[in-house]
């Protein structure tokens, strides 16, 4: 993956995965999904004592990234976890701010004989980015020539100054497993089971540019809201 120049922004894939298969249509916008929690990204826990994990770091210029998780077992067979991640990064260039949020809740239940397992999660997340379309050719030339007025990246002119896009998603997921054999060890790789899954996910993507721009040609010479 090749990242853009700000945290929480898009990633460009430098290769293609020929083994990835999707049985249902996807929304696209793959470059925006690098920080999007997919079904397989959600974790389920089983802990003897309550566990808390905190993560914090500063971002580019102004902003912070934090992620908090707490999980505990109400009894030896039932666990739940709650997590929240928030990120805001101003970026090095004009109109490049990122603002991401993600709330996750998951649970894990096992019967006493471990023949039945029930897991599920709920996720609500949004990934918002200001888009500047890159630095103008004139500003890039002045920066490369070492013009003292253009040493700071934050003063370079960009192609788009009011553009914004956002990807929102909500998902509910449940899975039931009934093990026919091989339940004496949760890590038994020779087990046999039947399962049932339920997945309900909605995604919403919007792109707005309230300032007239000729960057995309006459087809987008007016205000854009798509």
How would you name each of these model-derived features?
Residues 2, 25, 90-102, 106-168:
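Outer-membrane beta-barrel translocator/channel fold
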Residues 25-27, 34, 38-70, 91-92:
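Short strand-turn segments of transmembrane beta-barrel domains in outer membranes
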Residues 42-49, 76-77, 112-115, 181-192:
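Short loop/turn motifs that connect adjacent beta-strands in outer-membrane beta-barrel proteins
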Residues 44-50, 81-88, 142-158, 217-225:
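Flexible, solvent-exposed coil segments and beta strand-coil junctions
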Residues 48, 62-66, 99-103, 168-172:
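Residues that define the transmembrane beta-barrel architecture of outer-membrane proteins
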Residues 54-58, 84-86, 120-124, 192-206:
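Transmembrane beta-barrel strands of outer-membrane/channel proteins
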Residues 68-72, 82, 105-109, 174-180:
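Residues on the lipid-exposed face of transmembrane beta-strands in outer-membrane beta-barrel proteins
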Residues 154-226:
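Face-selective signature of the C-terminal outer-membrane beta-barrel domain
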